[in-house]
Amino acid sequence: MHSWLLLAEAATPKGGLFDLDATLPLMAVQVVVLTFVLNALFFRPVGKAVEDREGYISTSRAQAKEKLAQAERLEAELKAQLLDARKQSVAVIQQAEEEVDRLFREALAVAQSEANSVREKARGEVDAEKAKAFSGIDAQAEKLSSLIVDRLLAA
Amino acid sequence: MLLHLPLAELEVGHHLYWQIGNLNIHGQVFLSSWIVIGALLAVVVLGTRKMERDPRGVQNLLEFLWDYLRDLARDQIGEKVYRDWLPFIGTLFLFIFVSNWGGALIPWRIVHLPSGELGAPTADINTTVAMALLVSLAFFYAGLSNKGLKFFEYYVEPTPIMLPFKIIEEFTKPLSLSFRLFGNILADELAVAVLASLVPLLVPLPVMLLGLFTSAIQALIFATLAAFYIGEAVHEEAH
């Protein structure tokens, strides 16, 4: 049945456990050929894939680190800007308050002085009118008294 | 060499011989090695067909394997030249691993061969010696191509007294590499076969699980030692 496997049974050697024969060099050649075949089919492509991935991972890691550093720098910068802006806004508010205060005081002072002067003037006028009225009354009283005297004397 | 047991026969050392010219080869080793190599290549082709940056399915497994083998090669050989040797170390590991596990998991007994039987290709001494000799060749090639003739300073370092030991080591390295793998896998297959022939149900299961464990460990040991030897050859002394 398996006679095709028996290429030549005629001069079969004795055999044995330590039967070294042409199997040895042929097996050596087979292993060497297998080395080249596996190098082409296995070691080179898989090595390339693994090393490519290692390269990809290390470059993306470096990139990510760089981006993180950039983000941190940006954050610090923005925080500083924010602090600056806050300080500025506080200063502006303070300034505005002071300005308002000053303007209010100025306006108040102006209004007060104006009111004072108007009042003074009004008082002066009142006094003058009073004086004038008094002097008019005096003259009329004198006239009346002289008229009365005249009438009495004439009677 | 037949091992006679009360319930079943266990064949050891029987081979399916193919003849090419004047040369005999073990057909069952090649048949089973083609099957496990085919399975390995099928997984690889399936997993690399559509590579994506977000891995999916089999690609995950392949990337895990690649990463594992890269770490193994890099730890033993060093950052500088491990890339040149990763395919060789990785192929040794993958081939031994799928051979060992294939030998343990595929029901080879379904197929009846005229002689011998299918099993893990690594349970044949020819396979393991072939790979161990390739490691030795790789050792010298790596040393000579990286350092030129200065590579031979390795034999007199740290002191020339080491010379005979280091020369002996060149012979013991492939010997221990090949016999460790061969012995472990064959012993595992035999233990499972013997237990299965005595008690066919349940009892062999723990031994089979242990066999899977040792199979994986043996693949790791072979690949690690091969990488370590190559690393020794290319190692730069800090003078």
Swiss-Prot record, chain B:
Membrane-topology descriptor: Multi-pass membrane protein
An example Gene Ontology CC term for this record: proton-transporting ATP synthase complex
Statement: the UniProt record of this protein carries the keyword Membrane: yes
InterPro entries the record matches: ATP_syn_F0_a_bact/chloroplast, ATP_synth_F0_asu, ATP_synth_F0_asu_AS, F0_ATP_A_sf
Compartmental location: Cellular thylakoid membrane
Domain of life of the organism encoding this protein: Bacteria
Residues annotated as transmembrane: 27-47, 86-106, 125-145, 190-210, 211-231
One Pfam family cited in the UniProt record for this chain: ATP-synt_A
One GO molecular-function entry: proton-transporting ATP synthase activity, rotational mechanism
Keywords on record: ATP synthesis, CF(0), Hydrogen ion transport, Ion transport, Membrane, Thylakoid, Transmembrane, Transmembrane helix, Transport
Subunit and interaction comment: F-type ATPases have 2 components, CF(1) - the catalytic core - and CF(0) - the membrane proton channel. CF(1) has five subunits: alpha(3), beta(3), gamma(1), delta(1), epsilon(1). CF(0) has four main subunits: a, b, b' and c.
Function summary: Key component of the proton channel; it plays a direct role in the translocation of protons across the membrane.
NCBIfam families: ATP_synt_6_or_A
Similarity comment: Belongs to the ATPase A chain family.
Protein name stated in the entry: ATP synthase subunit a
